[in-house]
């Protein structure tokens, strides 16, 4: 069901407001809005949350802040105080409602446990915010959870422009989770529908009527029936679960107020809630992953400059070096990769990739490079490309440095890595387990495309590891000194093929016996993380996909002609992967709406 459009006058004001202000015309009478901020143990997300609120393209003189915080065991209160001291005077009104004690609810098992008392207190707070907005004379109130980051600075204008009584901007997450339901049972529980995934994945776009929105939504206080909306106490006839989001959904239904979700635009991100037995560290790790997803998919999150953030302490996480192979002419990839490592507190060192575009056939031969006799791409049948030569030489230079410096073990990343959830923690645990089991290894894939996963065997005593089979990609791997020596000793430049075909030859898992016959010994000891810890940022067919190895010239062609080798299936998304949207995600959804 499509929504009615906003009143023409309001649409015009929302559209012309920024231009009128820039031209020095008196500020247009835009609707007054209350931003309701309810924070508990939100130190990990507050800087980005507040930064997003600061960047909303809406006159602060037409906005009021209603801010409450309670039951904190972190620095949430101090952060909010610091932020309000810096920006509060810019807003039309500020309500500050902190509670320092108690720090816990009596019956809670942990800070993420939702007890009945906690639900009631939250409903009372939201009702206070709603009452303040009405008394202040606001036209709208925006509720936005503190781990919901509105990266689209036009969010308020876009939502108001729909002219709807209750409307939510659809937010993206690390999983299938979002801030709306498409179905609800007569008892007030979540009901699965055929419409949810097409809406969540934006296969259908627009504003759609739904039974519930939560976490972030805009409510009009001038709409018909809006005066009957309430969080607490629940409606006299209320028998549904005692939960603030369900109570409000019932209130909307009882008042005849329609609820919509809009997904025509990318509005921002929301963190997937952790389970009740998990803690703040789990939530922090999840939010870091959300930041990384935003770095890939955009728009990026930007932290407020008005709050003091916990300092980062990057390290090499037990490796002697962390290499990042990156083309100098792809600065966006390089910057994103370094920003991702910084968020995970991993200290990486950029290695300028050998650029295949800059190579000609004579330069390639002067480097001692020659093609492996008979090599053809396994799918397209093409020969080696200059991009693949550059990629191989880039990895080769790292292997040389490992041997020259005697580095015991290193990490190697290409610059198109999408990190899975808790990458650092999972990698650290994996390496600790490998050390504890005294496993002898040369190379461990962290990201790859498995060709025959059903033929791979688990490593006894190491549930997160399998013996690597034939694989594509070299986007992320760990390498030991002994492994680097074996790779160099095989003298691969004299019989080159793509590096992701060379590695399986060296651990004797390549299916082509003719290729393997050129290399001996094939004794590289290779394993792989399972589940994988990294994936490509994009795949062939994605709008943002770009490959400097697949879109390239044949290795001995100096005509400057670029060919996109669409016949290769290496860069396609694996049909075995359970994916959502444009990327694979490692978190399993644990939303509060699965009641």
Swiss-Prot record:
Keyword Magnesium listed: no
Tissue expression profile of the protein: Ubiquitous. Highly expressed in secretory and nervous tissues.
Disordered, as annotated region: 548-595
Molecular-function annotations in GO: identical protein binding
GO biological process: cell adhesion; leukocyte cell-cell adhesion
Highest taxon in the source lineage: Eukaryota
Position of sequence motif Prevents secretion from ER: 592-595
Gene Ontology cellular-component annotations: endoplasmic reticulum lumen; plasma membrane
UniProt keyword annotations, A-Z: Cell adhesion, Endoplasmic reticulum, Glycoprotein, Signal
Record's signal peptide: 1-22
A UniProt-annotated Pfam family: Glyco_transf_25
Localization: Endoplasmic reticulum lumen
Mutagenesis or variant effect for residue 450 to R: Exhibits some galactosyltransferase activity
Annotated glycan sites: 75, 153, 237, 360
Bias type Polar residues, positions: 580-589
This protein's record includes keyword Endoplasmic reticulum: yes
Biological function: Probable cell adhesion protein involved in leukocyte transmigration across the blood-brain barrier. Does not express any beta-galactosyltransferase activity in vitro.
PANTHER family: INACTIVE GLYCOSYLTRANSFERASE 25 FAMILY MEMBER 3, PROCOLLAGEN-LYSINE,2-OXOGLUTARATE 5-DIOXYGENASE/GLYCOSYLTRANSFERASE 25 FAMILY MEMBER
Assigned protein family: Belongs to the glycosyltransferase 25 family.
Name of this protein: Inactive glycosyltransferase 25 family member 3
Source species of the chain: Homo sapiens
């Amino acid at each position: 069901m499509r929504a009615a459009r906003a009143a023409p006058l309001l649409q015009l004001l929302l559209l012309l407001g920024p231009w009128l202000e820039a031209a020095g015309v008196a500020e247009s009478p835009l609707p007054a809005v209350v931003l309701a901020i309810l924070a508990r143990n939100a130190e990990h997300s507050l800087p980005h949350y507040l930064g997003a609120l600061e960047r909303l393209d809406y006159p602060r003189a037409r906005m009021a802040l209603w801010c409450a915080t309670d039951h904190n065991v972190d620095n949430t209160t101090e952060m909010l105080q610091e932020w309000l001291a810096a920006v509060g005077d810019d807003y039309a009104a500020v309500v500050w409602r902190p509670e320092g004690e108690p720090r816990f609810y009596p019956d809670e098992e942990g800070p993420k446990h939702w007890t009945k008392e906690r639900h009631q207190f939250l409903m009372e707070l939201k009702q206070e915010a709603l009452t303040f907005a009405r008394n202040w004379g606001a036209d709208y109130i925006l509720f936005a959870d503190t781990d919901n980051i509105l990266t689209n600075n036009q969010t308020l204008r876009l939502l108001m422009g729909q002219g709807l009584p209750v409307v939510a901007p659809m937010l993206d997450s690390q999983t299938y989770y979002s801030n709306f339901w498409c179905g609800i049972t007569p008892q007030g529980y979540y009901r699965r529908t055929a419409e949810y995934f097409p809406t969540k994945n934006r296969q259908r776009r627009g504003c759609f009527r739904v039974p519930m929105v939560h976490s972030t939504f805009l409510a009009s206080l001038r709409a018909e029936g809006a005066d009957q909306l309430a969080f607490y106490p629940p409606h006299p006839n209320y028998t549904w679960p005692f939960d603030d989001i369900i109570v409000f959904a019932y209130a909307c239904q009882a008042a005849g107020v329609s609820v919509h979700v809009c997904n025509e635009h990318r509005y921002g991100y929301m963190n997937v809630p952790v389970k009740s037995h998990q803690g703040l560290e789990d939530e922090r790790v999840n939010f870091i992953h959300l930041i990384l997803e935003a770095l890939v998919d955009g728009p990026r999150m930007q932290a407020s400059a008005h709050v003091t953030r916990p300092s980062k302490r990057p390290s090499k996480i037990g490796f002697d070096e962390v290499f990042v192979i990156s083309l100098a002419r792809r600065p966006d990839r390089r910057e994103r990769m370094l920003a991702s490592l910084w968020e995970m507190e991993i200290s990486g060192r950029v290695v300028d990739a050998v650029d295949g575009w800059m190579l000609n056939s004579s330069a390639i031969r002067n480097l001692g490079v020659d093609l492996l006799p008979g090599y053809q791409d396994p799918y397209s049948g093409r020969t080696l490309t200059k991009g693949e030569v550059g990629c191989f030489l880039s990895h080769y230079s790292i292997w040389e440095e490992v041997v020259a410096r005697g580095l015991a073990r290193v990490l190697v990343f290409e610059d198109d890595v999408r990190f899975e959830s808790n990458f650092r923690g999972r990698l650290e645990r994996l390496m600790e387990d490998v050390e504890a089991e005294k496993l002898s290894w040369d190379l461990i894939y962290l990201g790859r495309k498995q060709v025959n996963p059903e033929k791979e065997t688990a490593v006894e005593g190491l549930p997160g590891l399998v013996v690597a089979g034939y694989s594509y990609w070299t986007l992320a791997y760990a390498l030991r000194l002994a492994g680097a020596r074996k790779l160099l000793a095989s003298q691969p430049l004299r019989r080159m093929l793509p590096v992701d075909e060379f590695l399986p030859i060296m651990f004797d898992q390549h299916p082509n016996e003719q290729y393997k016959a050129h290399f001996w010994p094939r004794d590289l000891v290779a394993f792989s993380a399972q589940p994988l810890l990294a994936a490509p940022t994009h795949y062939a067919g994605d709008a943002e996909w770009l490959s400097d190895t697949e879109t390239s010239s044949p290795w001995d062609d100096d005509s400057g002609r670029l060919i996109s080798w669409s016949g290769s299936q290496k860069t396609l998304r694996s049909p075995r992967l359970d994916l959502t949207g444009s990327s694979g995600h490692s978190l399993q959804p644990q939303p509060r709406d699965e009641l």
